[in-house]
Amino acid sequence: MNLSKLGKNQIRATVRAQIHPDGQITGDRNAVYMGQYAANLRRRYYAAKDSTEYINQLETEENIKVKKFETRELNVFSPRITEFLDFEKQATVNDDLIYVNPMIFLHVSKCPFIQTERQLPLEMPYTEHILQATMLTIPEGYAVEELPKPLNLKTEDGQDIVRYNISQSGNTINVTYTSVSYTHLRAHET
């Protein structure tokens, strides 16, 4: 019996940020963690010595400076946690160009598959679903020279999907990132 889809394991995040002429990015993120993501956040939060240590770890992982941090449902028995944070991040500036990764908060910062040998199928502990919407406002007088291309990827069986859509409307860059991963990665049969 497959029990992997009993609960919803999801992160839904909205990021609103402003890029300043000096390359400073300021903004806020509102994220809802559900299921195993909420359990993992609780585990990491309580493993830290205090909230300051947790925030310091978050700043290091995300390469940001947290200005304000708040959670809801962290201390209750609930399948979800809501996290609010105000942040600052420095983009790379070269002369009058500002280089920005529109994915301010990365879904994956390093590959989890680091073993030299792997046996397929790979079994993941739970189904993952990440949805992140980012709205970046560029500084007045600046123009976007190049945007990454939209990307849609999926496995042959359609079980794992990554969608990365990016567009510009006026001085706002909109990024929608969706990743859905199920619990098995199988070897391709020829």
Where are the predicted features?
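A sensor for short, sequence-defined functional sites
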Residues: 1-186
